[in-house]
Amino acid sequence: MPPRKSFWSGPKAGIIGVSIAVGLAALSWAGNNLGGASGSYPEATHKVTLPKTLLDGGYTLAQDLSEQGESALAGTSEADIRDAKAVVGQYTSVDEDGAGVLVLSGMYGRIKNPDSVRSSMLKGAAEADGATVAVPPKDIEVAGSDVTVSCEVVTTASAGGEKTPFAMCAWADDNTGVSVAEVTPKSVAQSPESIDLDAAAANALKVRDEIRKPIA
């Protein structure tokens, strides 16, 4: 059976649903589980967008879920973030052999403590129903970039009890905080420990370059 059919015919709906839930849980934690940093709020200079394609056209936007993201951010503490706006999208691969799913869940605003936002997003991922952190978060420095990306491996349990592993990465800066979860046939077939988090971090930075734009 071709990889695309085997991947999409069974776990597709569950994988998409749980990966979206994981992204929304991460977003909720980013806005509501921070400690309250000292100092002033940065100037708002950048925003997060939802382009029609990602990763050089490899993924196409299937759903704009930003309204659900706004609900996840409801009650966001202004102790660390001001003027927060949610941006959430689900993308699917345009490659017939790839059959990937990518969920982008983030926000933009004025972020006082980006490091806390980044770590909170990954902590929040484990709060989604059916999700477990199989490989704990680690900070990854990608060559050629001064942006710290944190990545972990999350597993989700299907109705049949099978676990689906995927990498989830997050970054945050003075204006943007985003998590990126990508599920592919390759990741589904791997053990959590064998998923390449360095490659996932590099991909997350490519996504960052494509979605983070100056405020006009």
Description of each model-found segment:
Residues 43, 65, 206-209:
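Membrane-topology and secretion signals of cell-surface/extracellular proteins
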Residues 50-167, 175:
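A small/polar (G/S/T-enriched), proline-flanked helix-loop surface module common
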Residues 10-18:
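Short, hydrophobic alpha-helical membrane anchors of single-pass surface/secreted proteins
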Residues 17-27:
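Core hydrophobic alpha-helical transmembrane segments of single-pass membrane proteins
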Residues 8, 26-47:
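C-terminal region of N-terminal signal peptides and the immediate post-cleavage residues
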